[in-house]
Structure formats: structure tokens, C-alpha cells
């Protein structure tokens, strides 16, 4: 039975049956057959071919990358079937027969029975070019990639054109350039992993040095919906980072929307994340109290900027120590904006119309109770998360730990506060990071007290009594440690 009867006419190449795609790529890789079809692929440029050659040097399939790039320009399994007809690769046509609609199967007979050019009745892919033109010049006529099309659609739906401005103001790079920058996304270049992607260290030409490349991976979700979600997160982060420039927000340098794996390029943060430094990973030296003060205030200012700049506040939605990054000067910068949303400020207790959201998937230990139970989304969600971060900075403890009798950090701090009151001692004597240098002088003691107090206030279960980010920063500044002269 021919199972192609129910096949949609528009199936992007990466979403065809995996085993069929692998068999096709194996044949195209043999004797570099893929190079013979590349000139017949509209939209494929010489630099794409060169990038595929470099990709093969990393023991990867060059034909798989070629097909992924071609798909990103708007070409489907139907176009691939027609390409094989045009280049008379009958074996590959038969191999992928089940992946295209039956009305195109007549092309196999055409190829078998004739050595002439395939009938003009076949649907022509947009922007067809000859092999000779590919050799002489870059092909400029091609369909927009699904990513670019989605970006364009989102831009048109945005009344302030923020996405269009973001894309126009940010350097586009090719997937091949990122492959070269990261040595083929080598495992040795991995500097971080998360639920939505992997971050690689790389050296990208034109950016002046080392960069961080975030590659949004599919995990176990290779569906079209999964691909769209990864694209949505990339576009959301691109729009936010390009729109909001601040000393404490991670700068974005470039982006790539080719293929099924969108990538964003950022400033490389040589001191890693706040989480890394609090846990002293890789043998790093514990943060001093002056550094903790500057990180707390700087990160607070960055988050406060998002909440207060513009008519509509930006809610980050995933504030945690892993998403506060530290540059070579230990200056904090907030990153990972893939989950952020426009939202509501909740400055008054009588706020009656908070945004109800179901798409924020922030780390559970940092999520406010009103979001967990009712999906209520206001700026106070970020305030709650930041309160947890401040308690981590004070104590060096994780936001959640199975090894503690009281697993949640807020509850753990409250237990210690009650214990300190019973012993008639300051809570800082119990709730303090033992790895940090000893407190020196009243200023450092006062700052730690403030850190604990405002951390608990920010992480209050009642969102209506939580302070705003501007109030938190103001309070920390009043109780800050004078800089060392």
C-alpha cells in the first residue's frame, strides 16, 4: 500500500521520516554526490557549499547540513523530489516516494523513460537558477526561510515594529559561520546547558574576539510545533535584547535563523554565572561581600529597567542565579530572555487585572505561588524570583535542596530567623555563606542584614506586599558597603 496518499504537499525536509532522510544523506555523502546537486538548488550560495565542506571535516554529514540550509529557505520534500528528478537520481526518488504526494509520482516514469529535461508541468521551486550561475555568482533570488517568514509575520503584527527594528539592527550570520566559530559545535566548546539550548564558546569573525553562541536544541521534540517554539523563543529574545540596552542586560551581537536550530550570539561572560561563583565551581574563589553587593545592586537595576522602561513592562519570567552572568569585571548582566513577556506593573494592592499566562516555564523553585496556582503574571513574579536570588547570595545555599530538612530556601531562612530570635542573636550569624570571607566592619554586617531582609520581603507569598524592584535597589544602596579606595 502506498502510504503517500495522506502526505501533505508542504512538509519541510527536516520533518520527513528520519530513517528516510538518513538513507538519502548516506547516499549523497558517498563520493560527495551532494556537490553535484548543489548547483541545481535555488538559494544555495557558494559560501553554503564551502560551509558544508567544512562541516564534513568534523565527521558530520555535509548533505544533511545542505538539505537543512535549503529547507530554511522555504523548500520542502516536494521540491527535493523534483530536484532528484531534475538531476535524474531515480534511486533517491524511489527512496523518498512515500514522503511526497502521489500526484508527483509520475516524475519517476518521466526520468526512467526519457533523458530529456523533466516536464515543465512539475511545480517549479521559487527562484530556479542554472548550475553555471551558481558557479559565477551568488544566487540572490530565493524564498524567505520559515524563520524569516515567521519573523516578518510577527513584525507585521507588532504595532511598534520592535522585531523588525531588532532584526535590522542586529548582525545576521550564517549557520556555517557559527559552525566554524565553534569547531562544529564541539563538546569541548560547551560552556552551559539548559532546558532550551546549549551555549558554546566560539570565535566569530567580525565581532572582535570570543563570543557565546546559544543553539536552541530540539531535545526529544523534533515536531514542527517544537521547531516553531524554538523559533519563537529566539525571536522573543532577539527582540528584547536588541530593544533594551542597559549595562546590566546581556548584549546580543548576532543571530542565525537558518535551519531547524536557531542560534543567538552574545558577549562572552568570562566569569560564568552567579550560580557558578556562589557554588565555587571549577575551583573559583568565593565572592567577597563587596562583590556580592555590586552584583545584587547591578542585577536589580537591570531587572528594574525592564520593569520601568517604556509603556509596557517586560517580565523576564526566569530570573535565577544561572541567568545572571558575570563579565571579566564581575559586572552582572541578566540573560536568557526566551521566556520573557510584555506584562503588567503591579505597584498597588488593588491591582485587579493581572495577566493570566500559561507559557512561562521558569524554574519551579523560583516561581511565585500565585503563578504556580493561577498563572498570574505581573512584575511581582520577577520580584519573587529576585528575592530568592538575594537569599542565595547571602547564604550560598541553593534555591531548593533535597539535602536540607527545610528544602525551600525561603522557608529555610524563616526557620533560621526564628532560631536566631530564640537565641537572641542576629540571623546573619546562622544564615550566612560559610565559604565567603569573614564579615569586616559594621558596613558588611549591615549589608548582609539588608540582603536577608529585602530577600524575604521580595519572596513574600503575598504578591501585593512585595516591594518593587526600584524599592529593592534603593534599600540595598542605602545599606551598601562603601567601595574600597
Curated annotation (Swiss-Prot):
Residues binding ATP, per UniProt: 191-199, 214
Cellular component, GO annotation: cytoplasm; nucleus; plasma membrane
EC number: 2.7.11.1
Spans through the membrane: none
Keywords, sorted A to Z: ATP-binding, Kinase, Nucleotide-binding, Serine/threonine-protein kinase, Transferase
Active site: 318
GO BP terms, alphabetized: cytokine-mediated signaling pathway; innate immune response; intracellular signal transduction; lipopolysaccharide-mediated signaling pathway; Toll signaling pathway
Tissue spec: Expressed in the nervous system.
Biased composition (Polar residues): 115-132
Molecular function in Gene Ontology: ATP binding; protein serine kinase activity; protein serine/threonine kinase activity
Biased composition (Low complexity): 142-152
PROSITE patterns: PROTEIN_KINASE_ATP, PROTEIN_KINASE_DOM, PROTEIN_KINASE_ST
SUPFAM superfamilies with a match to the protein in the record: DEATH domain (SSF47986), Protein kinase-like (PK-like) (SSF56112)
Region (Disordered): 115-155
Reactions listed under catalytic activity: L-seryl-[protein] + ATP = O-phospho-L-seryl-[protein] + ADP + H(+); L-threonyl-[protein] + ATP = O-phospho-L-threonyl-[protein] + ADP + H(+)
InterPro entries, alphabetized: DEATH-like_dom_sf, Death_dom, Kinase-like_dom_sf, LRR_Rcpt-Like_S/T_Kinase, Pelle_death, Prot_kinase_dom, Protein_kinase_ATP_BS, Ser/Thr_kinase_AS
Residues annotated as domain Protein kinase: 185-485
Role noted for this protein: Through association with the adapter actl-1, may act downstream of the receptor complex composed of ilcr-1 and ilcr-2, which is a signaling complex that modulates neuronal activity and animal behavior in response to sensory neuron input.
Assembly and binders: Interacts with actl-1.
UniProt record similarity statement: Belongs to the protein kinase superfamily. TKL Ser/Thr protein kinase family. Pelle subfamily.
PANTHER family per the UniProt record, alphabetical: LEUCINE-RICH REPEAT-CONTAINING PROTEIN DDB_G0281931-RELATED
Name of the protein this chain belongs to: Pelle-like serine/threonine-protein kinase pik-1
Gene this chain is encoded by: pik-1
Amino acid at each position: 500500500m502506498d502510504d503517500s496518499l495522506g502526505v501533505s504537499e508542504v512538509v519541510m525536509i527536516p520533518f520527513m521520516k528520519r530513517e528516510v532522510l538518513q538513507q538519502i544523506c548516506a547516499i549523497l555523502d558517498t563520493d560527495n554526490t551532494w556537490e553535484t546537486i548543489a548547483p541545481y538548488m535555488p538559494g544555495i550560495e557558494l559560501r553554503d557549499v564551502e560551509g558544508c565542506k567544512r562541516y564534513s571535516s568534523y565527521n558530520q554529514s555535509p548533505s544533511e547540513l545542505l538539505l537543512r540550509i535549503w529547507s530554511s529557505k522555504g523548500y520542502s520534500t516536494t521540491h527535493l523530489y523534483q530536484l532528484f528528478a531534475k538531476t535524474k537520481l531515480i534511486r533517491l526518488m524511489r527512496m523518498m516516494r512515500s514522503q511526497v504526494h502521489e500526484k508527483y509520482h509520475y516524475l519517476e516514469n518521466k526520468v526512467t523513460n526519457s533523458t530529456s529535461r523533466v516536464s515543465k508541468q512539475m511545480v517549479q521551486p521559487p527562484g530556479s537558477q542554472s548550475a553555471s550561475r551558481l558557479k559565477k555568482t551568488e544566487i540572490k533570488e530565493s524564498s524567505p526561510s520559515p524563520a524569516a517568514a515567521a519573523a516578518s509575520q510577527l513584525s507585521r503584527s507588532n504595532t511598534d515594529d520592535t522585531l523588525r527594528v531588532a532584526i535590522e539592527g542586529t548582525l545576521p550570520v550564517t549557520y556555517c559561520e557559527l559552525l566554524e566559530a565553534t569547531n562544529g559545535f564541539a563538546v569541548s566548546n560547551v560552556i552551559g546547558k539548559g532546558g532550551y539550548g546549549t551555549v558554546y564558546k566560539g570565535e566569530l569573525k567580525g565581532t572582535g574576539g570570543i563570543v557565546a553562541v546559544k543553539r536552541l536544541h530540539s531535545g526529544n521534540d523534533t515536531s514542527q510545533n517544537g521547531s516553531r517554539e524554538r523559533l519563537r523563543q529566539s525571536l522573543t529574545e532577539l527582540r528584547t535584547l536588541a530593544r533594551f540596552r542597559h549595562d546590566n542586560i546581556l548584549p546580543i551581537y548576532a543571530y542565525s535563523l537558518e535551519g531547524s536550530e536557531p542560534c543567538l550570539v552574545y558577549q562572552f561572560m568570562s566569569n560564568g554565572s552567579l550560580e557558578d561563583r556562589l557554588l565555587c565551581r571549577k575551583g573559583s574563589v568565593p565572592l567577597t561581600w563587596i562583590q556580592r553587593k555590586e552584583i545584587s545592586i547591578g542585577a536589580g537595576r537591570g531587572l528594574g529597567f525592564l520593569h520601568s522602561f517604556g509603556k509596557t513592562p517586560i517580565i523576564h519570567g526566569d530570573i535565577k542565579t544561572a541567568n545572571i552572568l558575570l563579565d571579566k569585571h564581575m559586572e552582572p548582566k541578566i540573560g536568557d530572555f526566551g521566556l520573557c513577556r510584555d506584562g503588567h506593573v503591579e505597584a498597588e494592592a488593588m491591582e485587579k487585572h493581572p495577566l493570566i499566562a500559561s507559557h512561562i516555564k521558569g524554574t519551579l523553585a523560583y516561581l511565585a505561588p500565585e503563578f504556580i496556582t493561577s498563572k498570574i503574571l505581573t512584575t511581582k513574579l520577577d520580584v519573587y524570583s529576585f528575592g530568592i536570588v538575594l537569599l542565595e547570595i547571602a547564604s550560598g545555599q541553593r534555591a531548593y535542596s533535597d539535602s536540607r530538612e527545610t528544602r525551600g530556601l525561603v522557608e529555610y531562612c524563616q526557620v533560621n530567623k526564628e532560631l536566631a530570635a530564640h537565641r537572641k542573636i542576629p540571623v546573619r550569624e546562622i544564615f550566612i555563606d560559610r565559604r565567603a570571607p569573614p564579615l569586616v566592619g559594621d558596613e558588611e554586617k549591615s549589608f548582609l542584614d539588608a540582603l536577608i531582609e529585602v530577600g524575604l520581603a521580595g519572596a513574600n507569598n503575598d504578591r501585593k506586599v512585595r516591594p518593587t524592584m526600584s524599592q529593592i535597589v534603593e534599600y540595598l544602596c542605602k545599606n551598601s558597603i562603601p567601595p574600597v579606595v
